[in-house]
Amino acid sequence: MNWPFFRTAAVLFIFLVVLEVNSEFRIQVRDYNTKNGTIKWHSIRRQKREWIKFAAACREGEDNSKRNPIAKIHSDCAANQQVTYRISGVGIDQPPYGIFVINQKTGEINITSIVDREVTPFFIIYCRALNAQGQDLERPLELRVRVLDINDNPPVFSMSTFLGQIEENSNANTLVMRLNATDADEPNNLNSKIAFKIIRQEPSDSPMFIINRYTGEIRTMNNFLDREQYSQYSLAVRGSDRDGGADGMSAECECSIKILDVNDNIPYMELPSNSLQIEENSLNSNLLQIRVIDLDEEFSANWLAVIFFISGNEGGWFDIEMNERTNVGTLKIVKPLDYEEVKNLQLSLGVRNKAEFHQSIMSQYKLTATAISVTVLNVIEGSVFRPGSKTYVVTSSMGQNYKLGEFIATDLDTGLPSTTVRYVMGNNPTDLLAIDSKTGIITLRNKVTREQYNLLGKKYQGTILSIDDALQRTCTGTINIDLEGSGWEDRQTDGAVTGGGTITSTNDFTPSYEYTTTNTEDVYSVTPTGNGVRVRHPLDNVHFGPAGIGLLIMGFLVLGLVPFLLMYCDCGGAPGGGAGFEPVPECSDGAIHSWAVEGAQPERADLTTICVPQVPPDNANIIECIDNSGVYTNEYCGREMQELGGGERTTGFELIDGGKISGAPEICQEHSGTLRRNSMRECREGGLNMNFMESYFCQKAYAYADEDEGRPSNDCLLIYDIEGEGSPAGSVGCCSFIGEDLDDSFLDTLGPKFKKLADISLGKETEPYPDPDPSWPPQSTDPICPPQGTEPIGSGHPPISPHIGTTTVISESTYPSGPGVHHPMPIPDPLSYGNVTMTESYTTSGILKPSVHVHDNRQASNVVVTERVVGPISGANLHGMLEMPDLRDGSNVIVTERVIAPNSSLPTTLTIPDPRESSNVVVTERVIRPTSGIVGNLSMHPDISNTHNVIVTERVVSGSGITGISGGSGMGSSGLVGSTAGVGGDGLGLSSLGGGGLSSGIGGTATIGHLRGSSEHHFSNTLGSASPTTTRSRITKYSTVQYTK
């Protein structure tokens, strides 16, 4: 036994025990009992220099200062030296600061503020014991302070609205969605334990969903979800902490659940049965509309239907096309039906969806058939070639009129050869074949020559037309001929042909070919153009010689001289005395026509529709050119098939370079193929029958003549003075106000021929015309201007006394411009008719008030316009019809136009209102009445006393006479009273009165002598005879009145 080892171990053990006993560190913990308010201190000893863990806890959200000091630390080294205690960590010298403090001498740790567990769930305090030199006497100690949790946070859902979806007819307890909610309180604590609950469901017929209380999973309660009933559900879910306790906090969220569609509805057709009638050999793309009804979601694969044939369509005659936007099927005929084969059909249709049926109804699906009865109607079909083509072999030994065979059409209705058709050749290259129009026997027109053999390229393909005149139908058959063997003879001609010729036959239905020949010894090249037809061309032996090169160079040199010649060309000028370009006069657009004949533009006639008369055939076997009635329409399968037959005839002439040379047969080649009914043929002759043309245009002329006789005759006076459109309403008015707006200076440059007209238009003095009637006393044209203070006297009128200023009276004479003077004619009654119809306001009975438009602008210009006042024939009275409003402000304008009265009394005066302010203008135009006296037909109101008053009366027409124009007294300065064109029963009076001022009334007019007539027949036409709304008058400058038709 090793006793020294045991002795050493025992000594060391005793030393450690002594050391531990002498270095003891105590910790006292204060325990505060909140129930009874007592405080207890517990001493904890740390052995082997290890700190005892700090077990004190603080409650969040409360004031824990009443529990201070919450802990106390002590070091055994404080027995023999001074010890300083310090702490550090979160809540002390790290955020949040200052929550814990320590007494450096006693080691007591105090809490100073309220703590939040969600911010800091616990605190770690590092404790140190230091000597006077600041050195650690003990190893740092970690104290943990736990924060007790309270329920101060509600649950929070991760989304405000949760979205989910599930198929309809799903099994019960199928997971729909899972809700997610959190609580910020202490995990695994009752404060953070959330319980879920469904509090509301929309629609709320019956509960369809359940939720797991702890996990938040939403599942189906049953398998009764039906999208066709409800396509969406809305749930309200509440989450409460403390496991759903009454003292817990809660939150709510929304859940939207979409029900997905499955193919759980069997489609069906709207009509269970139907019946149809169709014609044989017809096609129809819209025979029947079949609507499918499906309750699944529209435009989805579960809704889209497919209609199929169960039976009855074994021949593939019908097809069904579905419209995916409407789910409607269209029954179509894609193959013609033959009445002789099928007379009735029973179609059985079924329907299904594009998507497979859902497993919930898979066992319930049963195919339901929809019956459609189809009746085929018989039509007259005509004849066809069966088979459609035949092939023959032709050798060089076969001569003219050799019978190749027969090609007979078959009547589809009877199945026998047709006996009501005639046969003609359609496409017949090189005029090789001929066919008998009755029997359909095909023969060779002539023996095949070497030229034909080379041109056809050993292969002939032509067409034969079978024309049924009774049914107006045409069918086409194809002829194929193989040219075999050798020993083909050359073409025989009556004489040698010098030079070359070209025969070309080209149309829209046959392959083109070209044959060129110079003599019988030339070498040809043959080029195929398709469809077995070849083109022969002579070998190229033309060369570009020196003469041609020289001519080409000469041409370029001449072109180089053109710019120099243009430099010396007078382009419009006349430096050498030439006339130059003649300017085109204005208004010459109608003198240049785009057609070559005078008169109106000729009508464009479609000459292609003119039928050329045909020559009747002399030989039945030789088919002439068929006319337009030889082609008929075939209508099969709903499409219009129209074909034109072919035929030839020999004219004995050949058309070469615009001339005809005898000795060469001409082929009148027909266009063959598909054309429209009654389409015209085109022959290479290019001419038309002139007899037919003459007949055509004669019928056209008679048609125009008949049309002119049927039109209403215009042998009466037109409404307007010009042809064309009527004049706008109100275009003829008082033109005396627009004279200064017209610029007539351009009349000075017209030349001597228009000098006289220019002088008349400008109002200059002209030499009087010689008076052929010496009994007509001439009158002076000089104006009568009495001096100031004198009284100008008019015959039969009272004198005019000047009161203020100067009065000037100007009289103008008007002489007729014709070669002679006509006798004066009486003025007819302008209102000889009963009721008067105007284009503007009119009436047939009673008193018509004229429409007066008053623009009452305060302190502005006032305008009153009354136009075309018309009264009836019975007892009308114009008294009060011209009542004008009281225009109180300045610048008043009153216009009365075309006052027309019937055969009744016209009031002696036309009352003018009281325009009391300055600048008043009163205009009365065209006062017309029947044969009765008009005494003082215009009376001035005495109260027009202000300045700048203008009163104008124009064209006062009466049947018996005009007494005069009287003006009221008391006019101020600058007044003007004018009477223009006063027309009486004996003549025409023109006067113009003016002056600087009139102080007394004007009681008369200056009248032009005895004007008995004019060349223009002033009143030869009854006013209103052509149109009651038209006044045939025209006003020129200086009150000159001219009446025209």
Swiss-Prot record:
UniProt cross-references to InterPro entries, sorted A to Z: Cadherin-domain_protein (IPR050971), Cadherin-like_dom (IPR002126), Cadherin-like_sf (IPR015919), Cadherin_CS (IPR020894), Cadherin_Y-type_LIR (IPR000233), Catenin-bd_sf (IPR027397), Desmosomal_cadherin (IPR009122)
Desmoglein repeat repeats: 814-840, 841-870, 871-900, 901-928, 929-957
Domains as described in the record: Three calcium ions are usually bound at the interface of each cadherin domain and rigidify the connections, imparting a strong curvature to the full-length ectodomain.
Membrane topology: Single-pass type I membrane protein
Subunit architecture: Binds to JUP/plakoglobin. Interacts with PKP2. Interacts with DSC3; there is evidence to suggest that the interaction promotes cell-cell adhesion of keratinocytes.
Stretches of the chain found on the membrane's Extracellular side: 50-546
Keyword hit for Mitochondrion: no
Gene Ontology BP, a term: homophilic cell adhesion via plasma membrane adhesion molecules
UniProt name for this protein: Desmoglein-1
A Pfam family hit: Cadherin
Biological role stated in the UniProt entry: Component of intercellular desmosome junctions. Involved in the interaction of plaque proteins and intermediate filaments mediating cell-cell adhesion.
Segments on the Cytoplasmic face: 568-1045
Provenance organism: Sus scrofa (Pig)
Main localization category: membrane
